């Protein structure tokens, strides 16, 4: 499976974000891969 790019949904695939990204639950929204801070 290819990794999930930035701003794309990672629901049910929390460990699949591309390098440097992490799955984050946005307020009142869905989970997306975002850059780690």
From Swiss-Prot:
Annotated protein name in UniProt: Pi-theraphotoxin-Hm3a
Keyword vocabulary terms for this entry: Disulfide bond, Ion channel impairing toxin, Knottin, Neurotoxin, Proton-gated sodium channel impairing toxin, Secreted, Toxin
An example Gene Ontology CC term for this record: extracellular region
Predominant location category: secreted
Domain of life assignment: Eukaryota
Keyword Disulfide bond applies: yes
Cysteine pairings via disulfide bonds: 3-18, 10-23, 17-33
Metal-binding found in the keyword field: no
Additional detail: Is more stable than psalmotoxin-1 (AC P60514) when challenged with either high temperature or human serum. Negative results: does not show activity on Nav1.2/SCN2A, Kv10.1/KCNH1/EAG1 and Kv11.1/KCNH2/ERG1.
Gene Ontology MF term list: ion channel regulator activity; toxin activity
Free-text tissue specificity from the UniProt record: Expressed by the venom gland.
Purpose of the protein: This toxin acts on different isoforms of acid-sensing ion channel ASIC1 in a similar manner to psalmotoxin-1 (AC P60514). On ASIC1a homotrimer, it provokes a pH-dependent inhibition (IC(50)=39.7 nM on human and IC(50)=1.3 nM on rat channels), whereas it potentiates ASIC1b homotrimer and ASIC1a-ASIC1b heterotrimer (EC(50)=178.1 nM on human ASIC1b, EC(50)=46.5 nM on rat ASIC1b and EC(50)=17.4 nM on rat ASIC1a-ASIC1b channels).
Domain notes from UniProt: The presence of a 'disulfide through disulfide knot' structurally defines this protein as a knottin.
Subcellular location(s) of the protein: Secreted
Family: Belongs to the psalmotoxin-1 family.
């Amino acid at each position: 499976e290819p990794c999930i790019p930035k701003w794309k949904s990672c629901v049910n695939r929390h460990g699949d974000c591309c390098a440097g990204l992490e799955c984050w639950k946005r307020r009142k929204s869905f989970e997306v891969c975002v850059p780690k801070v």
